[in-house]
UniProtKB/Swiss-Prot annotation:
The keyword Calcium does not apply. It comes from Legionella pneumophila subsp. pneumophila (strain Philadelphia 1 / ATCC 33152 / DSM 7513). This is NAD kinase. InterPro entries: ATP-NAD_kinase_N, ATP-NAD_kinase_PpnK-typ_C, NAD/diacylglycerol_kinase_sf, NADK. One of its GO terms (biological process) is NADP biosynthetic process. NCBIfam families: PRK01231.1 (NF002306). It is found in: Cytoplasm. The active site is at D74 (proton acceptor). The gene is nadK. One of its GO terms (molecular function) is NAD+ kinase activity. The keyword Cell inner membrane does not apply.
Length: 295
């Protein structure tokens, strides 16, 4: 039997404030009230929803028996992950989004699937995040974390951008493209997949670099060691500013001549699943793959 939980922190993003999310949050409160669980909400949740639960400041999260319950889609869980790794608190998701690669529990299954989890019946896996720094000469002026991907892209202009990629201080290539996606295995079924990247099992210790519309027929996705340190040097020949984004949320300007450094974050996300969760079932369901022919 694994760890049982005594406190639940409900998390929902402000811009996901719709009736469906609201219904699931209230259903959670009603259910958790019957399970001898202390119920709290995050400050983001309290800003958009009226729940009968006190706000737990983030600096007070991280007790041994805490569990963060995310209501929303994968984007909501991505946002919660950056909070969760700082307090080493496990996360589980109620899917109120579209695909739901990370949010396992369907709204109608809250009681039947979450109940066993609260009592220690679950699978736990660790997912790593990428930590990004932007440097102006020797000083960094931005740091961000991404569970899915870090994306270097064009600003407001529509022409190709130029940059050099180094791995462990060794030059890989000079690129002329629309940008570059640096993805974790978790993010390999997200934006990187749309750009032609491979699907990687989430327990792989690897990072994939996926060029976006490269001006070279030989430019292909590159899978590298997860411990590698990646540097993107922005060419001074770029006539406009570029942008770096972490999981599509945190976005910052990168100027010609600057450097972006990306490596694995030392903290891991503790992601929980119900006992009947299977990764390949999720892939088959979410991506519309065929099941075994019956007949």
């Amino acid at each position: 039997m694994k760890q049982k939980f005594k406190r639940a922190i409900l998390y929902a993003r402000q811009h996901r404030a719709n009736q469906e999310v609201n219904e699931s949050l209230h259903r959670l409160v009603d259910f958790l009230s019957t399970q001898d669980i202390e119920i709290f909400q995050d400050s983001d949740t309290a800003a958009s929803f009226e729940l009968k639960a006190p706000v737990l400041p983030r600096e007070k999260m991280g007790a041994k028996h805490d569990l963060i319950i995310v209501v929303g889609g994968d984007g909501s869980l991505l946002s919660a992950s950056r909070m969760a790794i700082k307090v080493n608190t496990p996360v589980i998701g109620i899917n109120r989004g579209r695909l739901g690669f990370l949010t396992d529990i369907l709204p109608q299954d809250i009681e039947s699937h979450l109940g066993p989890v609260l009592n220690g019946q679950y699978n736990e896996e660790e997912r790593f995040l990428l930590h990004t720094k932007i440097y102006d000469k020797e000083n960094s002026y931005f740091e961000g974390d991404a569970l899915n991907d870090v994306v270097l892209g064009r600003g407001s202009e529509t022409h190709l951008i130029e940059f050099d990629v180094y791995i462990n201080q060794q030059l890989v290539s000079h690129y002329r493209s629309d940008g570059m996606i640096l993805s974790t295995p978790t993010g390999s079924t997200a934006y990187a997949l749309s750009a032609g990247g491979p699907i990687m099992h989430p327990q792989l210790n690897a990072i994939v670099l996926v060029p976006m519309f490269s001006h070279s027929l030989s430019s292909r996705p590159l899978v590298i060691d997860g411990e590698a340190e990646i540097e993107l040097y922005i060419s001074k020949s770029n006539e406009t500013d570029l942008r770096i984004s972490c999981d599509g949320h945190e976005s910052r300007v990168v100027k010609p001549g600057q450097k972006v450094a990306v490596k694995k974050n030392g903290n891991r996300l503790r992601l929980l699943h119900p006992l009947d969760y299977h990764y390949y079932d999720t892939l088959r369901s979410k991506l519309g793959w065929e099941s075994k022919h019956q007949g």
